[in-house]
Regions:
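Flexible "cap/lid" loop of the alpha/beta hydrolase fold
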Residues: 106-107, 112-146
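Conserved alpha/beta-hydrolase catalytic His-Asp/Glu region
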Residues: 127-131, 146-207
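Active-site glycine-rich loops that stabilize anionic/oxyanionic intermediates
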Residues: 19, 27-30, 95
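Short beta-strand/loop motif that positions the catalytic acidic residue
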Residues: 211, 217-219
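Serine-hydrolase catalytic-loop signature spanning alpha/beta hydrolases and amidase-signature enzymes
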Residues: 27-37, 48
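Active-site loop/oxyanion-hole signature of alpha/beta-hydrolase fold enzymes
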Residues: 39-40, 49-92, 96
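Conserved alpha/beta-hydrolase "acid-adjacent" motif
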Residues: 224-229
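Catalytic histidine neighborhood in serine/cysteine hydrolases
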Residues: 234-242
């Protein structure tokens, strides 16, 4: 299995195709397998790199809470690219991965050719902060007490996932199965140290105003916790090549 090291943590990755590189950064509820259809398509013309975040086997699962958090996730993208000798790439992130990808664009500007930011920003708006943090910590406790298999049933039937079940049952079953296979400890610490502690995207207003990387924001029309912050980002922060 191919691995790279990021601050001493082993990250599993897969590389498919040849051409200009695209780095895919997965969401909390999934792993690199969620990008299968995208890799099948884009690897015809691009080099596609997917990887599992720290805490997601077969990547290393540290038991030290200090080894988790959004700053580590941003640096993990950069360290993966450095290990693979990639100077810059298109970066595509979903949800939690979109948060890391967007902040990667702030910290490592020269390494990002463009950013595709999908479903970013849960809990970013002031009225959502308290409820989001409470939910994140409750889910972390559930992973420890009940395990990934039972929590997968809760998450896969939540409001933001139910349309996948309605429209693509096979895809939904695959999502649920993958989530059941995740590490209890890795998922809990990711939720506690990354999701529950990450700053609001609104805190980066000045940095976003200076961003000159092409950014595509994408959000589902029923992704209620992300709609408002994406509109806010478009109007106030990101120039989006205007």
């Amino acid at each position: 299995m191919p691995y790279v090291k990021s601050n001493k943590i082993k990250l599993y990755y897969e590389e498919t195709g040849k051409g200009y590189p695209i780095i895919f950064v997965h969401e909390f509820g999934s792993d690199l397998r969620e990008w299968e259809q995208q890799v099948r398509h884009f690897s015809r013309e691009y080099k596609c790199i997917t990887f599992n975040a720290r805490g997601y086997p077969p990547s290393e699962v540290p038991e030290d809470a200090k080894q988790y958090g959004y700053k580590h996730s941003v640096d993990d993208i950069a360290n993966l690219m450095k290990e693979l000798k990639i100077n810059n790439a298109h970066i595509i992130g979903l949800s939690m991965g979109a948060y890391a990808a967007l902040l990667f664009g702030l910290k490592y500007k020269k390494m990002a050719k463009s950013l595709v930011i999908a479903g970013v920003g849960s809990g970013a708006m002031p009225q959502h902060r308290k409820g989001f943090f409470s939910m994140a910590n409750e889910l972390a406790d559930e992973f420890i007490k009940k395990g990934s298999k039972k929590v997968a049933s809760i998450i896969s039937n939540s409001g933001s996932r139910i349309q996948l079940k309605n429209k693509d049952l096979r895809g939904w079953l695959e999502f649920k199965k993958h989530l059941e296979e995740h590490s209890n400890i890795g998922s809990a610490l990711t939720m506690q140290q990354y999701q529950a502690l990450r700053p609001s995207l609104m805190d980066f207003e000045n940095e976003f105003k200076r961003m000159n990387i092409p950014v595509l924001l994408a959000v589902g029309d029923e992704d209620e916790l992300c709609l408002e912050i994406n509109i806010y980002l478009k109007r106030h922060f990101l120039k989006l090549n205007e």
